[in-house]
Curated annotation (Swiss-Prot):
Belongs to the dGTPase family. Type 2 subfamily. This is Deoxyguanosinetriphosphate triphosphohydrolase-like protein. Keywords: Hydrolase. The gene is dgt. The keyword Hydrolase applies. One of its GO terms (molecular function) is dGTPase activity. The lineage of its organism: Bacteria, Pseudomonadati, Pseudomonadota, Betaproteobacteria, Nitrosomonadales.
Length: 374
């Protein structure tokens, strides 16, 4: 761990610790240990075959939840270093924030949430926490990964008060309107930077959106013009890459400068004092407006594109069919999950489906419903 952390940064010495006590790791900080445990987890490896926007088999070059998580971690660490925050904590949060995502991206989550409405619903942040607290089975003396409080808290972006009470100390900030650590705030916005800009990149690669369309979007048009001015002969993938690269750099610089100013003005002197302040990590008003314009464009032209909607519809059908089949006949679950169904009820079905990769979900559907000669 760096020795020049700001007093308001989370550190080993002011961490609230782990649910189950462990001796301090040799040669690593507490949050390096958290990061390492996440990277070595089964759930993390599965992210390689979980959708970001495009279903995994649609192309080899589109982003997955794994590549997205790595990109978020890189952005988060860069900003954390400039703000003298705890880079290892930011990395641990960003690498674990999507562990609970279903197959097929948001279409899969929406479908599973609908299936679970009667049983408390489904939300991927809470499922990510469940993965690191309960579902990973790697260690001799505890379930889950036994991560530090601050890493676990950082996984949770939004939790309704109706569910926050069941989270004990983790739910306190949602019940009382307190802020999260600066590292958690940063991880949230690093996710937003990566998500929007890399969806632009993937959308252009897929051909579902075009440069001509994006030239109507202020932040993209400005950076496209700058790239063309600097490199008059640039075309194709290089032009797109340099434009997206410039957009990400602008957002990183803006977030760093604006957040640094807000932190100085608020003068927090400890991680606990941060919780009593309003959210301090944020963009300028201009960048927020431009980001919202880009989000609206992506929602209308990429996420609602008929080809993406077709993929989403197939994903929803697959998730719903798997859930209702297992609900009606739990004996069709793998034996391990039949046992868990006895203990957790429908949550066990949600755990099983949420843990699937895109490919596994498709194959499980085929195993259950496809009639073949074999």
């Amino acid at each position: 761990m760096r020795s020049n952390l700001a007093p308001y940064a989370v550190s080993d010495t002011n961490s609230r610790g782990r649910r189950i006590h462990e001796e301090l790791p040799a040669g690593r900080s507490q949050f390096q240990r958290d990061r390492d445990r996440v990277i070595h987890s089964t759930a993390f490896r599965r992210l390689e075959y979980k959708t970001q926007v495009f279903v995994n088999h649609e192309g080899d070059l589109f982003r997955t939840r794994l590549t997205h998580s790595l990109e978020v971690a890189q952005i988060g660490r860069s900003i954390a270093r400039n703000l003298n925050l705890n880079e290892e904590l930011v990395e641990a949060i960003t690498l674990s924030h999507d562990l609970g995502h279903t197959p097929f991206g948001h279409a899969g989550q929406d479908a599973l949430n609908d299936c679970m409405k009667t049983y408390g619903g489904f939300e991927h942040n809470l499922q990510s926490l469940r993965v690191v607290d309960v579902l990973e089975e790697r260690y001799a003396t505890f379930n889950g990964l036994n991560l530090c409080f601050e890493t676990r808290e950082g996984i949770l972006k939004r939790v309704p008060k109706s569910k926050a009470a069941a989270l004990d100390e983790l739910g306190t900030r949602f019940l009382h309107g307190h802020s999260a650590s600066l590292e958690a705030q940063l991880a949230n916005l690093a996710d937003e930077i990566a998500y929007n800009n890399h969806d632009v990149d993937d959308g252009l690669r897929s051909g579902l959106i075009t440069l001509a369309q994006l030239e109507e979007i202020e932040i993209f048009a400005r950076h496209l013009h700058q790239v063309k001015q600097h490199y008059p002969d640039i075309t194709g993938r290089r032009l797109i890459h340099e434009t997206v690269r410039g957009m990400i750099n602008t957002l990183v610089v803006d977030l760093t400068v604006q957040s640094g100013t807000r932190i100085r003005d608020a003068s927090p002197d400890s991680p606990d004092s941060v919780r009593e302040k309003p959210v301090l990590i944020g963009f300028s008003d201009t960048i927020k407006r431009q980001q919202q314009e880009l989000k609206r464009f992506l929602h209308k032209n990429l996420y609602k594109h008929y080809q993406v909607m077709r993929m989403s519809n197939k994903a929803r059908h697959t998730i719903e069919k798997l859930f209702t089949t297992f609900e009606t006949e739990p004996a069709l679950l793998p034996y391990e999950y039949q046992q868990k169904f006895q203990e957790y009820g429908h949550q066990a079905i949600a755990d099983y489906i949420a843990g699937m990769t895109d490919r596994y979900a498709i194959r499980e559907y085929q195993r259950l419903f496809a009639i073949t000669e074999n």
